[in-house]
């Protein structure tokens, strides 16, 4: 039986054969870094879920306008609901990484998946919030907000919560980008100083 450490004919170890050594200080820094990412994802989830709920419950009766009558408000609801689901999934992968000390998928796929989806969903929230803010401003100039102040106020709150979710997801995207850069430079998602 061949020894797992004996390489023949100039073979080199693959990334799977390569284990990363981390000192206690480095392990603590990695734990703090992963905790910060988990906290950002939790904040993104909270704000996007709150925005979706505020938009979903924004109806005052049959005489009042409904959120689903406006394309931009439907966009805000759907975008924030998608980001809330994505954030729950990403929080699960963070917890998996804490408990198992490995990624859910192969490392190369995981870092690119996180970064790419953080980018796409950040832009989705930004575009939904921008479209809804423009509509809310237009409505404020017309008769809609003078007759239905509560509807406009709740729409503004939902839009603001969506922008807050965007900010936290954008910060999370920066950390995911840092992981991609570390992966490209060192072959691992771990920090450059490990």
Curated annotation (Swiss-Prot):
- Decide whether keyword Iron is in the record: no
Keyword annotations: Cell membrane, Membrane, Transmembrane, Transmembrane helix
Q: Could you name the Gene Ontology cellular component terms for this entry? A: plasma membrane
Instruction: Report the main location listed first in the record.
Output: membrane
Pfam families linked to this entry: CASP_dom
Q: Which domain of life is it from?
A: Eukaryota
Q: Which residues lie on this side of the membrane: Cytoplasmic?
A: 1-35, 96-114, 179-194
The taxonomic lineage of its organism, from the top, reads: Eukaryota, Viridiplantae, Streptophyta, Embryophyta, Tracheophyta
User: How does this polypeptide assemble, per the annotation?
Assistant: Homodimer and heterodimers.
Protein's cellular compartments: Cell membrane
Describe the family membership recorded for this protein in Swiss-Prot or TrEMBL.
Belongs to the Casparian strip membrane proteins (CASP) family.
Q: What protein name applies here?
A: CASP-like protein 4C1
Q: Which residues lie on this side of the membrane: Extracellular?
A: 57-74, 136-157
Provide the membrane topology annotation: Multi-pass membrane protein
Organism of this sequence? Arabidopsis thaliana (Mouse-ear cress)
Q: Which residues cross the membrane?
A: 36-56, 75-95, 115-135, 158-178
């Amino acid at each position: 039986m061949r020894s797992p450490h004996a390489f023949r004919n100039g073979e080199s170890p693959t990334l799977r054969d390569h284990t990363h050594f981390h000192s206690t200080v480095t392990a603590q820094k990695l734990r703090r870094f992963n905790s910060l990412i988990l906290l950002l994802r939790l904040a993104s989830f909270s704000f996007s879920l709150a925005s979706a709920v505020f938009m979903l419950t924004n109806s005052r009766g049959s005489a009042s306008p409904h959120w689903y009558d406006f394309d931009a408000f439907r966009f805000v609801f759907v975008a924030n609901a998608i980001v809330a689901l994505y954030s729950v999934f990403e929080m699960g992968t963070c917890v998996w990484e804490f408990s198992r000390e490995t990624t859910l998928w192969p490392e190369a796929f995981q870092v690119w998946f996180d970064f790419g989806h953080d980018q796409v969903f950040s832009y989705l929230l930004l575009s939904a919030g921008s479209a809804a803010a423009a509509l809310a401003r237009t409505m404020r100039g017309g008769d809609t907000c003078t007759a239905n102040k509560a509807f406009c106020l709740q729409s503004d709150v939902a839009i603001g919560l969506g922008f807050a979710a965007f900010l936290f997801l954008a910060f999370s995207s920066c950390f995911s980008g840092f992981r991609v850069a570390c992966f490209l430079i060192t072959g691992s998602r771990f920090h450059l100083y490990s």
